């Protein structure tokens, strides 16, 4: 009888323990933001301090706030108000988020030797890759020269040494476009919110810009595909890497472009010439501590082209993966830092 009672107690205790141990779930959230889509996945083992519904609401609020500050398409955004302001050399107060993103863009302008320039917007718009409508014909040299005179990181002054950051412009026509880095910042903001909610394993993606931490439900680093450029427009995978505790972003010329008289014009503009880039680099993927940094670097390094991008990457210990177009198809190259990271992270 004692053995029977002991057995019943043991079974009851086992059932009680099983009930206490909550099953780990994969929470998937998605939506639209910044003219594209976002996807968030995180593991919830019962330790997350908010419901998935509440988390989704907070993510939506974060992304709405980023858009309200940095969109060039919203006429009432903080960025648009600065662009519409025609006063020169007159500092205006800007939000801490705006200042943070702009400060990183200015830093990356130096790293990329001028290739990432957030003041290139007037020229981008002239080519039809911004809020302005696409022109029926290629801009004339005179049109380009006029707008090129408005471009240059030296045309803006950011002051973060006071309690409130300020920004001023040297010319009335100066126009700042943060689309090359704002999505990455949005990713980082969402990631920080997940960490505040005690999420230790997550993946955040906005329009291809990514940040991941921890492991997926299979206990492996988050598996992220690098897209392979194709001549048909179909999606294909070039490589898959395990991403853990870092950001990732890619830039390429195989999706957004237009053709005129048989000539292909990519959407990335070289701020030094005012013309769409002309080289054989089809895409570049960058790994960095934050998605914002990866986002900005991928744009700037892509503008530089395959040889210069790899040179800058090696010089600055940047993790980059390049897909290069040749007469016989595509070839790949990667920096020393990329090889080291993927060898240890996969």
From Swiss-Prot:
Annotated EC: 2.7.1.180
Classification via SUPFAM superfamilies: ApbE-like
Cofactor needs: Mg(2+)
Residues reported to bind Mg(2+): 180, 295, 299
UniProt enzyme class: transferase
Main location, first listed in the record: membrane
GO cellular component, one term: plasma membrane
Family: Belongs to the ApbE family.
Role this protein plays: Flavin transferase that catalyzes the transfer of the FMN moiety of FAD and its covalent binding to the hydroxyl group of a threonine residue in a target flavoprotein such as NqrB and NqrC, two subunits of the NQR complex.
Protein name: FAD:protein FMN transferase
């Amino acid at each position: 009888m004692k053995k029977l009672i002991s057995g019943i107690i043991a079974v009851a205790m086992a059932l009680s323990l099983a009930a206490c141990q909550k099953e780990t779930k994969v929470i998937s959230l998605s939506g639209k933001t910044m003219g594209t889509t976002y996807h968030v996945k995180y593991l919830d083992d019962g330790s997350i301090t908010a419901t998935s519904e509440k988390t989704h609401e907070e993510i939506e609020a974060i992304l709405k706030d980023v858009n309200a500050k940095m969109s060039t398409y919203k006429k009432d955004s903080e960025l648009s108000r600065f662009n519409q302001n025609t006063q020169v050399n007159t500092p205006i107060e800007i939000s801490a988020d705006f200042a943070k993103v702009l400060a990183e863009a200015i830093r990356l302008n130096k790293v990329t030797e001028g290739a990432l320039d957030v003041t290139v917007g007037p020229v981008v718009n002239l080519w039809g890759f911004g809020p302005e409508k696409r022109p029926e014909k290629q801009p004339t040299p005179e049109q380009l020269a006029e707008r090129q005179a408005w471009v240059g990181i030296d045309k803006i002054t950011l002051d973060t040494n006071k309690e409130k950051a300020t920004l001023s412009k040297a010319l009335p026509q100066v126009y700042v476009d943060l689309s090359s880095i704002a999505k990455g910042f949005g990713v980082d903001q969402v990631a920080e919110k997940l960490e505040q909610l005690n999420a230790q394993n997550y993946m955040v993606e906005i329009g291809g810009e990514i940040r991941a931490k921890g492991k997926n439900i299979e206990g492996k680093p988050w598996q992220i595909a690098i897209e392979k450029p194709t001549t048909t427009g179909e999606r294909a995978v070039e490589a898959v890497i395990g991403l853990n505790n870092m950001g990732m972003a890619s830039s390429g010329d195989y999706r957004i472009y237009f053709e005129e008289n048989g000539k292909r014009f990519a959407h990335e503009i070289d701020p030094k010439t005012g013309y769409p880039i002309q080289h054989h680099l089809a895409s570049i993927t960058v790994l960095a501590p934050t998605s914002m940094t990866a986002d900005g670097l991928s744009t700037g390094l892509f503008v530089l082209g395959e040889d210069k991008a790899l040179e800058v990457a090696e010089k600055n210990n940047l993790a980059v993966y390049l897909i290069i177009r040749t007469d016989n198809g595509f070839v790949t190259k990667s920096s020393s830092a990329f090889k080291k990271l993927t060898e240890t992270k996969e």
